[in-house]
């Protein structure tokens, strides 16, 4: 009975994050989507949609880079809503700057959003899940998790770091019954940003040539549902026509 547990989705944006939130809510979880406080209205819209469809949801405005904010968020969910069984770390932090135009401020902020915030999230999740020797901690990666593209020094280095955090946690927490996995999203996703910025890429949607958020969410649920004798710790997702 998943309704006895909560699922936290950090970075519950309009596409993938929302789809993952809805997916876990559809299976009965009390979902707790989180975004930056300035996006609380969008979170409320997401929660209302889930509630209207018969699920349970409460949105939280959280700065995932702030240690106290993350600690308080996890404590509230664990103690006032339901034991935390699933945590998905899904913030986007993608920026493009030639190396000479990459300021120290940009580099640090991207690292804070993609790597440091992931560490804080994983650590707090582990604290609560270890008490029960169960749970899933999932990190969303990208093409940049695997290779540093030209102009992506800040983003790639941060995503490399997040992948390392995930690998380390998987090895440490697996024997404790906690499933840690890293999802490499290798391709464009069906989002408003892609539609507006890369219309030629978005046109591939007619041929299933860009990743669909609901299909991504299906995979997260599948990995969460795996038997512990055959866990996946890293996988990559891309459209069938994507070159790799």
What are these regions (language model features)?
Residues 28-44:
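Conserved glycine-rich Rossmann-like NAD(P)H-binding loop of the short-chain dehydrogenase/reductase
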């Amino acid at each position: 009975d998943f309704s006895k547990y909560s699922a936290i989705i950090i970075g519950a944006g309009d596409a993938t994050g929302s789809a993952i939130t809805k997916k876990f809510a559809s299976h009965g979880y009390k979902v707790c989507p989180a975004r930056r406080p300035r996006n609380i209205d969008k979170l409320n819209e997401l929660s209302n949609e889930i509630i209207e469809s018969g699920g349970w949801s409460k949105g939280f405005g959280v700065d995932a880079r702030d240690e106290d904010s993350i600690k308080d968020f996890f404590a509230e969910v664990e103690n006032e809503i339901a034991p935390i069984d699933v945590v998905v770390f899904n913030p986007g932090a993608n920026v493009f700057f030639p190396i000479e135009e990459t300021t120290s401020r940009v580099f640090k902020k991207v690292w804070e959003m993609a790597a440091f915030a992931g560490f804080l999230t994983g650590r707090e999740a582990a604290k609560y899940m270890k008490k029960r020797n169960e749970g899933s901690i999932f990190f969303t990666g990208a093409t940049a998790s695997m290779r540093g593209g030209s102009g992506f020094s800040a983003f790639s280095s941060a995503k490399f770091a997040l992948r390392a955090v995930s690998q380390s946690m998987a090895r440490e927490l697996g024997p404790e019954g906690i499933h840690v996995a890293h999802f490499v999203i290798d391709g464009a996703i069906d989002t408003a940003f892609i539609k507006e910025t890369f219309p030629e890429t978005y046109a591939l949607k007619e041929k299933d040539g860009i990743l669909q958020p609901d299909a991504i969410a299906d995979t997260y649920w599948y990995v969460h549902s795996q038997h512990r004798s055959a866990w996946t710790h890293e996988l990559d997702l891309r459209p069938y026509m994507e070159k790799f």
